[in-house]
Amino acid sequence: MLLVEDEPVLLSALKKFFTREGFDVDCARELEEAEALIATTCYAVVIADLRLSGTYAVEGLAILRFVRSYSPATRSIILTAHTAPGIQRSARALGAEAFLPKPTPLSEIAATIHRVMAVAS
């Protein structure tokens, strides 16, 4: 699993939780770092924040495009505080299989991952 999140406290909490759940977890805090990892590692799932730079840029959509190009079998989930309907439609059109608002309970994120992975098999 690859977690892409710019907030260090949230990234650490997510990594700890999913490691305890039995996932192998890599982390990235920036778009370029995420792209480098996706280009060199085969992930079952990528969970990405929509906005990474603290600006209005939507790097999460670029990550979805990159996953689609480099690793089409990888499942993608967006976890974000920015949940406008237009953004959700764009994310789904680029391959996001789930769009979760922040905050979402960790157990619900885990259930979403398992659901997405079950559909993939």
Model-derived features with residue positions:
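Two-component/phosphorelay signaling modules centered on CheY-like receiver
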Residues: 8-26
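C-terminal output helix
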Residues: 86, 104-114
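Alpha4 helix (beta4-alpha4-beta5 surface) of REC/receiver domains from two-component response regulators
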Residues: 58, 62, 83-100
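The C-terminal output helix
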Residues: 114-121
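Conserved acidic carboxylate
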Residues: 5
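Short amphipathic alpha-helix used as the core "switch/output" element in two-component signaling
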Residues: 36, 58-73
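Acidic, metal-coordinating helix/loop segments flanking the phosphotransfer/catalytic sites
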Residues: 15, 27-45, 53, 69
